[in-house]
Amino acid sequence: MGLFFNNNKRKQKESQEIIIDANNVPAHIAIIMDGNGRWAKERSLPRTMGHRAGMDTIRKIVKECSKLGVRYLTLYAFSTENWKRPQDEVTALMKLVVEFIGKEIDELHKNEVVFNVIGDVSKLPELCQQSIESAKEKTKNNRGLTLNIALNYGGRDEIVSGVREIAQELLNKEINLEDIGEKLISEHLYTRGMPDPDIVIRPSGELRLSNYLLWQSAYSEFWFSNINWPDFTEGDLRKAISDYQNRNRRFGGV
């Protein structure tokens, strides 16, 4: 037990030692919250315990992002493909969404966080939908960090949905063919009105996007870590941001 707390103190100290340039903080950070299942397996625990531990990490990272001045934080929580998981795990995940909102929404509201969800919410359980709508309504006028939780989200599904909307507008003669371009497509995505992610972070050692923000991440920087999400700390976030600040973003130029 003593070693655990010593490690925590060491990590906190390391976090404070990482210097962040306040003038170059990413406006939008996207994170693939991966490794909950691995974390649980390493401890001979049910996968659901890994997801629960991951909730604590969300709380810490949201607070750190708010403190650093990040404007948008998008967290990949449940993909369109995750419905293929065992039913008991899916049910537990949906319950955790409701639990997280119930426990955290007052604190988020107090800290001026705007709560938002991206993805096809209509496919989620009714209680989950109600919790989401209530949280969005409560925080909609806040002026701090916008927290996007990606639920029943898939990058390809998002693009297909946006293209269908555009096609319908074209059929209805609301737009002309010449109007269709990157700007119009972006306006028909779940992230409309938000800047694209400056950096996409993925813990757990996996080196892929997993159908996450495919359109929006065209020019994002990527940062990968072998740490599982429940063990991801404020210090790890600062390392990612520090690395981002030392990169030269060219956006296709020289």
Predicted regions and their residues:
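Flexible, compositionally biased loop and terminal segments
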Residues: 1-254
